[in-house]
Amino acid sequence: MIVKGTYFQNSEEKPLVYGDVEIHNIPRRRLRGEEEKEGIIAESVFVGFCGTDYTLMNMGREGNLKQKFPEGCNRLINGHEGVVWVPDENRFAIVLIRGGNSYDPTRYTEEETYFEYGCDQADGLFSDKNYYNPDMLLKIPDGYVKDGKIPLSICKKLVFSDPYACMIFQRERMEDIGEAQNFRVKMAQYKCSEAEAREIARKETFDRVCIFGLGTTGMFIGDLIHQRYPDAKIVFVARSEESSPKVSFALKQSGASYVRSAFDTNEELADAIREKLGGTATVFIGSSGAAIEHEIAFRYGVLGCNGIYNSFSLGPEIAFDTMPFGFKNQVIFGSINFRQDHMEEAIRILLDSCYDEIVELIDKDEFTEDPVNAYENKIYAKGAPMKTAVIWNEQYII
C-alpha cells in the first residue's frame, strides 16, 4: 500500500523526506511466547515529535541508519508518540511502541530481539496509515471520545504516553533498587522486621532527589515521585531562568525547588544543590544529556552514601573514582524502557493532567514542505516549545 508520510533514509542532503512511501504488513509479536500477528490498519490522527527523531535524522545524515530500517526496506517511517484511529474497531488508540521476542521489554537479553514502531525496524506514526499488531493498540478509557471524534486537548495530553510510561518505570526501578540497597541498614536502624525495613527503605530512597535536566522526562519523573512521595525533597537543576514558564510549570507540578546552573565553577553549583536539598542526594537522576551530570554527582559529591545514580541521558560517558565510589556503597543504573502496564497507567494519569498546556502545534503543511528545516529551525531550535506536535488528520479532532 502506498501512503503519504515522512521517513528517514541514509542521505547527507535529505535524511528526512515527505512523500509517497510503501508500507508493508509484516507479522510481529508483542512478547516472547506469543504468536506473530499480521497488523491491522490504523490512521494517524495526532503525532508528537521526540528527541529520538532528531537523533535518527542525524544518523541518516551520517549514513548510519541501516540497522534501524524494517526488513527489506531502505527507509524508516518515523514517529512513535500520538493518537491513531483504528477503522476496523471504530476506536482511537495509543500505539504500544515496543514489541518483539522478549518476555519483558524492560529486561530483554542479548539473545532476544525487539522492534520499536517509528524508531527501530518498524514503521511509525508519521504517515497517513500504517499496520500495527492489534494487541499493541491500547484503548483510551471511555468518556473522552464522542461521535468518533476526540478533543484536541486530550490528544495533547496523550502525546506524552510514551515518555510518561518511561518515567513510571523509572520510579518503579528506583523503588526496587532503593529497597534492596538499604533495607538491611533500616532493619538495624529501626530494630524492625525485614518487611517493615523494606517499606522504610523504599520510601526513604526519595528523601532528597536531584533531577539534573528539565526537559519533559525530568519534569515527569519529578511529578511522579511527588505524587507517590509528597514529602520528598526534589530539586531540579537546569540552565533556564527560574522565572521561565517551563521552570514555573515544573515546580508547580512537583512541589520542587530549583537551582539554576549558571555558576562560575562546578564546586559552587554542587554546593548550591546540596544547600537546596538540605544534604546530599539519596537519588541523582541525570536527564540533561550533558557530561557534567556525573561530575556533579560523583566528583563534587552531590550523591550521598548508599545513594542511587539513575542515568537517563543518552550520550554522556560516566566516570568516577572507584575508591570513594566503593566505600560510599553507591549504585549506578540505566534502563530506558517500559511495559504495557506502565503505558496503560500513563494514559490514565495523563487524561486528568494539565500537560496539554505545554504542547504547541506546527502546521502540517509547514512540516511536510521541508521536514529537515522544520526540525532544525523550529521544533528543535533554541527557544522551541517543550513539546511540538502536529494534527495529522483533522477530521477526527474537535
Q: What residues fall within each predicted segment?
A:
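NAD(P)H dinucleotide-binding glycine-rich loop of Rossmann-like/cofactor-binding domains
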Residues: 99-208
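Rossmann-fold dehydrogenase core element
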Residues: 307-310, 320-360
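Glycine-rich cofactor phosphate-binding loops and adjacent beta1-alpha1 units
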Residues: 178-212, 226-229, 244-331, 397
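C-terminal hydrophobic helical "lid"/dimerization subdomain
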Residues: 1-3, 178, 268-271, 279, ...
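Glycine-rich beta-strand-centered segment in the early N-terminal region that forms part
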Residues: 29-48, 61-107, 123-124, 136, ...
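Glycine-rich Rossmann-fold phosphate-binding loop(s) that bind the pyrophosphate
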Residues: 163, 213-216
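Residues in the short beta-alpha loop(s) of Rossmann-like NAD(P)-binding domains
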Residues: 238-243, 315, 338
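Hydrophobic/small residue at the entry helix of a nucleotide-binding pocket
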Residues: 216-217, 242
